[in-house]
């Protein structure tokens, strides 16, 4: 067998299928673009759904890729098994209605066994097929020469996700030899069984049937191929190592961790070996995910990253690492993956900063968790139990990130145990919630629809013209071809030549009219058809529109003018964000309309007011410099060498359109732009907000919209100045004066309230009753808020020295209740928190707190007197 690195295997796979006429699809971002069904890209086929479901017709129906992927449904097994990972690469070859079983099997066999490629010994390979797939059996047996005894028929070899495309699959297994299993009495020791000897290296799915709603299967009009080979597993076989973690894809991270910890991998300690594996796996996942724009948080993708980092930190303690260190592994990951993913090294400083910040936070969290755990232990002792409940242990784990193992250690020190079964029950409930929320990757939807059949040419000329003579080359109504559209009817059409821009890259579509003799057609929207033509959504306002009609296509120039101002402004904004916030900023989405622009970008904190001011000023300065906007066509490699920014979620061909604003901004973009920045006029930021973990949004306006916004704001300023009887330029001074007056009045009010409270407290001492030898005061008082209630409580406790006091006040139909117990009575079992909870429950509320002071609220003012009457009963119950 050849000696190959993981990087060489990846490149060899892509080169092989490129030789077989496949287009190499770049590895997409781990953060799905326009696919809400996925938390992460989790397979090679996930990024190709648009081709399989017919929304987009690929230029080449043969596709190959090496797709980075994340799966987190089995995190707890990572490190325990030889091949569980959260981050992995899936190598695949795909056919969209082109070749089928014979080619897929033949090429897989060639790649695996040819000396030019991997060069496996054919005798060490076995395959599994579906019992009824005689076609696959014949190809394997007669064409590939695989003997019958190494072709295993298994019922589970059928790919089916319910309604939609489905079909049999065949899997290829490699025999690693007797060192990995030689007990042939083991019922699982066969290719396809649960064993370490026969490893699956490749899965070929033959999508040939449609699973109908009635449960029947019918042949698909177009048959597809979807294959997957895990790079990590393949590398472990080629490099002849026991687990994926022992390959050159993981060992550099393990080696770096050895250096940091002073511990050794594979030194006879299985727990420490597991820690090395967990750290190596999780830092790969976090590094790539952060590089693709995800950031740690308490929800969604961010929660996954936070959980992975915290799990790795917890395992690092087994290696005696008690400081932030994971960030030091980020450049190691970058070096391992630099051949295919150079962007990791390019972003290593930012990624390391994010990881270090999260590590530091978790070390603080561990400290906080210890405090919460101390409260849990105290509560358990108070309830006279030696078991920490599974609910409490899970809350510590899930909310505070406090590992169950640490909870058990602390519990043992306190002479207690943890309800592990209860904890696992809570974990299973969480898994059930996750399973319920998870959606299967529906990569191949039902085929059909006439738009995918339309192959006529349609040229977009809208960059240089706003009106053109054209012909209707395709006309569709209600999803079917039609020869005409009558007045009031809606439909879709294609033109042989069109000035109408189809919505893409965040820029909305043009609108306008198609005109002919006696015919007027409103163009409401324009989208890309499956084969790439501009598809116009129209409604006939006058006359009858027929297929092949000659029309004049005219866009709404006023609308386009506003759109291009906003689009060029987004390019200036993008660069300004990088200048002010840092090079880690990447576009995460945009919307360019005629009214405003919206720009989403990656950033791990709120943009401060002074930063926003700098960003806005930079954009306006570039507008006022009257910079020419130059647009050119470049080879993709040349454009990248120039430093052009490729945008989020976009796919680019060999030749790209480059939009350059002087020497300031350089981006790949297919949208429409101004000729000179001066046309934008002015740029004004309207809002900045967070829209998700690590993603911020800026909304802004330009030109006329910016003028109208600022004019409205100046008008409001003048109106406010008038009401305060001052000039706009003096309004801040006037506001400061008013605030000072209000503050002084508040002080006087508080002083007066305190005096009144003291007087009322003095009067209340006459209402003190003695219950079983305890001074008790329960009274409804007339105070404004809880602060005044606390002041009165302090006065009463000082005056009475030993007492149980409960005060209630009513304001705006809301009840405030405060309970206080002096120190001498706390030791006798009196507890303000328990008391106030009982009182509040009797007037429709709840609350709690410390033994000496506790507060609550109620919703039923009419029941306050009755609730206060309970205080005497409480004192009697404790004194017994």
Curated annotation (Swiss-Prot):
Q: What does the note under cofactor report?
A: Binds 1 zinc ion per subunit.
Tell me where on the tree of life, at the top rank, the source sits. Bacteria
| Primary residence | cytoplasm
Q: Which GO terms describe its biological process?
A: alanyl-tRNA aminoacylation
Localization per record: Cytoplasm
Q: Which SMART domains match?
A: tRNA_SAD
Q: Where are the membrane-spanning stretches?
A: none
Which cofactor names does the annotation list? Zn(2+)
The record's GO CC annotations read: cytosol
- Known EC number: 6.1.1.7
Q: Which reaction does it catalyse?
A: tRNA(Ala) + L-alanine + ATP = L-alanyl-tRNA(Ala) + AMP + diphosphate
Look up keyword ATP-binding and say if it applies: yes
For this UniProt record, the keywords arranged alphabetically read as follows: Aminoacyl-tRNA synthetase, ATP-binding, Cytoplasm, Ligase, Metal-binding, Nucleotide-binding, Protein biosynthesis, RNA-binding, tRNA-binding, Zinc
Under the heading Pfam families, the entry gives: DHHA1 (PF02272), tRNA-synt_2c (PF01411), tRNA_SAD (PF07973)
**GO MF, one example:** alanine-tRNA ligase activity
Per UniProt, Zn(2+) binds at 567, 571, 669, 673
Free-text note on domains in this protein's UniProt record:
Consists of three domains; the N-terminal catalytic domain, the editing domain and the C-terminal C-Ala domain. The editing domain removes incorrectly charged amino acids, while the C-Ala domain, along with tRNA(Ala), serves as a bridge to cooperatively bring together the editing and aminoacylation centers thus stimulating deacylation of misacylated tRNAs.
Which protein family is named in the record? Belongs to the class-II aminoacyl-tRNA synthetase family.
What biological function has been recorded for the protein in this entry?
A: Catalyzes the attachment of alanine to tRNA(Ala) in a two-step reaction: alanine is first activated by ATP to form Ala-AMP and then transferred to the acceptor end of tRNA(Ala). Also edits incorrectly charged Ser-tRNA(Ala) and Gly-tRNA(Ala) via its editing domain.
> Which NCBIfam families did the record assign?
alaS
Q: What is this protein called?
A: Alanine--tRNA ligase
Q: Which gene encodes it?
A: alaS
């Amino acid at each position: 067998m050849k000696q190959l690195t993981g990087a060489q295997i990846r490149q060899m796979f892509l080169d092989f299928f490129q030789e077989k006429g496949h287009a190499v699809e770049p590895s997409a971002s781990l953060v799905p673009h326009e696919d809400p069904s996925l938390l992460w890209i989790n397979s090679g086929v996930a990024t190709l759904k648009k081709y399989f479901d017919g929304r987009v017709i690929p230029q080449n129906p043969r596709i190959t890729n090496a797709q980075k992927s994340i799966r987190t449904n089995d995190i707890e097994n990572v490190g325990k098994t030889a091949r569980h990972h959260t981050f992995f690469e899936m190598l695949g070859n795909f056919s969209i209605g082109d070749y089928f079983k014979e080619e897929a099997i033949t090429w897989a066999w060639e790649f695996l066994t040819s000396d030019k490629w991997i060069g496996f010994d054919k005798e060490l390979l076995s395959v599994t097929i579906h019992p009824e797939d005689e076609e696959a059996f014949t190809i394997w047996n007669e064409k590939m020469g695989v003997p019958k005894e190494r072709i295993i028929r298994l019922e589970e070899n059928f790919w089916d996700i319910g309604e939609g495309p489905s079909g049999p699959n065949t899997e290829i297994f490699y025999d690693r030899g007797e060192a990995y299993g030689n007990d042939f009495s083991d019922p699982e020791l066969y290719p396809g069984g649960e064993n370490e000897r026969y490893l699956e290296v490749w899965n070929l799915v033959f999508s040939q049937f449609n699973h109908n709603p009635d449960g029947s299967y019918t042949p698909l009009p177009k048959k597809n191929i979807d294959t997957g080979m895990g790079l990590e597993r393949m590398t472990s076989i080629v490099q002849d190592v026991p687990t994926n973690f022992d390959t050159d894809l993981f060992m550099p991270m393990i080696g770096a961790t050895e250096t940091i910890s002073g511990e050794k991998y594979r030194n006879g300690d299985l727990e420490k070996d597991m820690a090395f594996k967990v750290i190596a796996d999780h830092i790969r996942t976090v590094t790539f995910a952060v590089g693709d724009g995800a950031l740690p948080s308490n929800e969604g993708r961010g929660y996954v990253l936070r959980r992975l980092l915290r799990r790795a930190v917890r395992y690092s303690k087994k290696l005696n690492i008690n400081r932030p260190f994971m960030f030091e592994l980020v450049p190691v990951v970058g070096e391992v993956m630099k051949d295919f993913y150079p962007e990791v090294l390019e972003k290593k400083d930012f990624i390391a900063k994010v990881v270090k910040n999260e590590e530091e936070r978790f070390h603080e969290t561990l400290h906080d968790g210890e405090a919460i755990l101390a409260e849990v232990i105290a509560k358990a002792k108070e309830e006279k139990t030696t078991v920490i409940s599974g609910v409490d242990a899970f809350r510590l784990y899930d909310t505070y990130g406090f590992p169950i193992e640490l909870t058990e250690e602390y519990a043992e020190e306190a002479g207690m145990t943890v309800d592990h079964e209860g904890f696992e029950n809570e974990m299973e409930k969480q898994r059930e919630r996750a399973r319920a929320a998870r959606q299967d990757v529906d990569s191949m939807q039902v085929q059909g629809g006439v738009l995918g059949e339309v192959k006529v040419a349609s040229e977009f000329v809208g960059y240089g013209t706003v009106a053109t003579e054209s012909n209707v080359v395709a006309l569709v109504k209600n999803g079917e071809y039609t020869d005409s559209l009558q007045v009031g009817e809606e439909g879709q059409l294609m033109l042989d030549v069109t000035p109408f821009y189809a919505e893409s890259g965040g820029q909305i579509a043009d609108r306008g009219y198609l005109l002919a003799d006696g015919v007027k057609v409103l163009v409401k929207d324009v989208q890309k058809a499956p084969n790439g033509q501009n598809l116009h959504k129209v409604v006939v306002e006058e006359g009858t529109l027929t297929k092949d009609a000659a029309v004049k296509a005219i866009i709404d120039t006023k609308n386009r003018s506003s759109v291009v101002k906003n689009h060029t402004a987004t390019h200036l904004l993008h660069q300004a964000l990088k200048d002010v916030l840092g090079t880690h900023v990447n576009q995460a989405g945009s919307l360019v309309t005629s009214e405003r622009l919206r720009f989403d970008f990656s950033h791990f904190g709120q943009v401060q007011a002074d930063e926003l001011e700098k960003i806005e000023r930079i954009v306006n300065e570039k507008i006022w410099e009257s910079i020419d906007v130059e647009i050119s066509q470049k080879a993709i490699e040349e454009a990248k060498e120039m430093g052009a920014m490729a945008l989020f979620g976009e796919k680019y061909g060999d030749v790209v359109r480059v939009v350059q604003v002087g020497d300031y901004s350089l981006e790949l973009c297919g949208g429409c732009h101004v000729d000179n920045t001066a046309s934008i006029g002015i740029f004004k930021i309207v809002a900045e907000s967070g829209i998700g973990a690590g993603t911020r949004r800026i909304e802004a306006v330009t030109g006329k919209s910016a003028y109208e916004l600022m004019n409205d704001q100046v008008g409001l300023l003048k109106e406010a100045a008038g009401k305060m009887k001052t000039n706009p330029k003096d309004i801040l001074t006037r506001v400061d004066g008013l605030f000072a007056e209000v503050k002084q009045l508040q002080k006087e009010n508080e002083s007066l309230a305190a005096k009144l409270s003291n007087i009322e407290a003095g009067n209340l001492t006459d209402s003190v009753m003695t219950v079983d030898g305890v001074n008790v005061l329960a009274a409804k008082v007339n105070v404004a808020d809880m602060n005044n209630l606390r002041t009165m409580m302090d006065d009463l406790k000082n005056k009475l020295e030993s007492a149980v006091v409960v005060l209630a006040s009513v304001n705006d139909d809301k009840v405030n209740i405060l309970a206080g117990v002096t120190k001498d009575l706390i030791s006798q079992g009196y507890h303000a928190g328990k008391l106030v909870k009982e009182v509040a429950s009797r007037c429709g509320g709840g609350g709690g707190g410390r033994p000496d002071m506790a507060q609550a609220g109620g919703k039923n003012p009419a029941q306050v007197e009755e609730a206060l009457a309970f205080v005497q009963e409480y004192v009697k119950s404790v004194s017994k």
